[in-house]
Amino acid sequence: MNLELFIAEKIHFSKEGDREVTPPAVRIAMIGIALGLAVMILSVAIVIGFKKEVRNKVIGFGSHIQISNSDAARSFETRPIAVTDSMLAALADNSGVKHVQRYSTKPGMIKTSDAFQGMVLKGIGPEYGSSFFRRHLIEGEFPQFSDSASTNRVVISKAIADKLKLKLGDKIDTYYIQDDVRARRLTIVGIYQTNFSEYDNLFLLTDLCLVNRLNKWHPDQVSGVELELYDYDKLEETTYRIADEVGRHPDPYG
């Protein structure tokens, strides 16, 4: 007879009439195993849910694919790339690409009467998909930003607003250093909160035109292009296809 089966039968059945009797120790062990499995399943579900939430927030701030200069991996102070209408159309026509949008960045500093905060001013145009920030907007509005005019409106995070004691409608003085120190006064029209501190403590959103002027760039130059995909699982193959497409559009500025 199989040894394991023999031991199991001895534990499971009593000597009196082969009645099924589950000793308390066995019952407790079974309950413990069931609880342990439940905790493991719950833990895995929480980890998967947290991972998905973090991924969605990263994508919300920067989309699935970013096309930019190679120095963008080291700094938000980047050299521009030229993005023509034909290039945008070609990227948008690529299978798997849901949406295409331009952006420009400029590192700077916010200064109030008694505090200061480093930040990155992100300029976006009218085509920017704002659904992510609208979902996380807690005060004010998320306006349609412009690529042809500077409205001096800005959307900031609650984390920065709380740290600098700012509120909706306040005007903030921002400073940027390149060849010289440049200043811009911006009006807070919206406050967002994603609870993703790595980004909430960093990004302000404003007109693409304003950031391009601070960078002294041509109207068709930007820090990069963000691409939203239909299917995250096809990210790798779409990235290779997009790389081939970008290679067909040389930068006229070198």
Segments predicted by a language model, with ranges:
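A cross-kingdom feature of multi-pass membrane systems that activates on extracytoplasmic/periplasmic
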Residues: 2-5, 229-232, 239-254
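Alpha-helical transmembrane segments
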Residues: 36-47
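Hydrophobic side chains in well-ordered alpha-helices
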Residues: 50-53, 87, 214, 238
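Membrane-interface junction motifs in transport/secretion proteins
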Residues: 51-84
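A short beta-strand structural signal in non-transmembrane regions
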Residues: 65, 160-161, 220-242
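Structural beta->alpha junctions
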Residues: 71-77, 193-195, 227-235
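A structural signal for hydrophobic secondary-structure junctions
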Residues: 83-220
